[in-house]
Every structure is written in C-alpha cells, then in structure tokens.
Amino acid sequence: MSGLAGGLAYFIPAAEIAINATSQVIRVTPSPTLLFSPTPSASSFPTASPVTGAFTVLLLGSDDDSKFSPDHVLTQSMILVRVVPSTKEVTMLSIPRDLYAHLSTGGYAKIDGAYSYGGPGAAIATVEQDFGVHIDDYIWVGLLGLVKVIDAIGGIDVVTSNPVMDDYYPADLNTSWPYGFQRVAVLAGPQHLDGVHAMQYVRSRHGDLQSDLGRSQRQQQVLLAIRQKAKQLSPADLPAMSAAIGGELKTSIGLSKVGALLPLAASLDNPEQIHQIVLLPPYTHGGGPDGSVVGNWNLILQLVHQYFP
C-alpha cells in the first residue's frame, strides 16, 4: 500500500464530464436502466446539499474497439474508490483483471468478464458479493473515451521513471485491422502526452521491469496528471468538453450529485489522505484456471473490511 494522489485524480473530473457527455443516468439497484435526457448546459447544475456521508464508486475501463460487440467488453481496469468527506480520506483498491471470482451472472471466471456478461450491473454485483462492499455509483470509460478526455484538456505532463518498450502493443485503434501489434516506446524523463500516447502508456503490459505493479503505477500517474489539468476547469467548460468527447463515457452519477461533488473535489488534495491498495502476494498468486490470478480471500476480506467498512 502507498499513499498516492492518483486515486482520486480521474474520479471527480470523469463524473463531471461523463454526465454531460452521455446524459445517462443509470440506476444501480436493482438493475441498471438507461435514462436519456438532453445534454445539460453549465448553468443547469442543480443546487445540492454538500456531500457529508462516505460513498463508494467503481471505476471501470475497457478495450471497446471493433473486435468486441458493444456492451460485451471486458474490464481491463477495475478500481474501487471510497471517499470519506468528513476526514478528507480517499481509499483505492485496484482489483486484478484476471482475479478468479464468483460472477454474479453465475459460475467462476476472471472478474473482468462480469461486465461482458451483464454490463455495469453485473460488474457491480460481482464486486459487491465477492468483496462484501456496497457500491453507490460507477463510471465506465472506453478506449476512445480516455483518448478524448485527455485531448480535450490539452494533453497531460508526466515524468517517466521507468521507460516502456513494448513490441506487442495491440493496434486496436486501427478500425480497418484491430488485430495487429505495434511498438510503443516511452523514454525516461519528462513527457507531454496526447490522448493516444497517454492511453498507450497506461495500457502497455510488456517491457516494464515492474510488471503489473508498474502498470498500476503508470495508471495512477496518468490519473494524477489528468486531475492536475482538470482542476483548472469550471462548469462553464463542460459543454465544450462534452461535445469533444461525445458518448464515450457512462456513469450512474446524477446531476444533483455532480453539483455537490464539485466543492468536495477541491478539498481532497492531501496525498497523505489518499491511499492505494494493490492486491499483490500474499493477497493473490498465479496458477489459477485459464491463466487467472487466485485470491487469498481471507486476507483480502480482512483488508477490504478495514478500508471499506
């Protein structure tokens, strides 16, 4: 575990942008249902009471290129975020995409398949039943969603400590042939990344000496960089960003809650109050069916109940 500000970096900006970009309100319980309404203007954020109670959000990221059927994609990134406004604490739990788990749709498989079988409702129900937590909302972003978010804020700046050299990066933004590979190289030192290069930086799974831990750290680094740029946004900027992003994000967070989260977001900037949990050994180990990761659920649940009471 380590205290990293990256955990919250994407959460609030994504909520603000997603509700404008998709105009979708999705009821999490008992079953997600899409409700459509016109894209709101910056002045349409309703006045809301401050958020005082703790809440938990599931962040989901997917490869949604043309190899996959719409809404039947895997979730390569699953991050559980708990925010406690009274103490200004944020806790993140990165869930291994290959974790062997009991899916809410039935049977056992890698946990990243829950979304493909039943959408956000199945992903939420799976995490709730296996980890013993309650999830209030979710945010989902696809490949183009991440690219468009970063491009809409003018790119991001990162300092790369571990260079990335990946000869087997999937060339899945190539709509004519999304099955090929390409070389991705990110050198050490300061880098300004546009949306495509930032996506490559966080998704690359090969050539990092720290393996999956390095990938998780890169994801958090990019989230922090997004947060730094998004902090400069005001509600007046959101309609233009919505037009740029299109419908590449989905969320269950309604307008009233977004309005209440705006002042809260500004107060959650203390890195010492933001914690990241990564389920490395002894919490998990390899050797599961179909290349999955096996969880030591006794240890996992003890940890989860400590940070997600």
Predicted segments — roles?
Residues 1-309:
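Non-catalytic, solvent-exposed segments at the cell envelope interface
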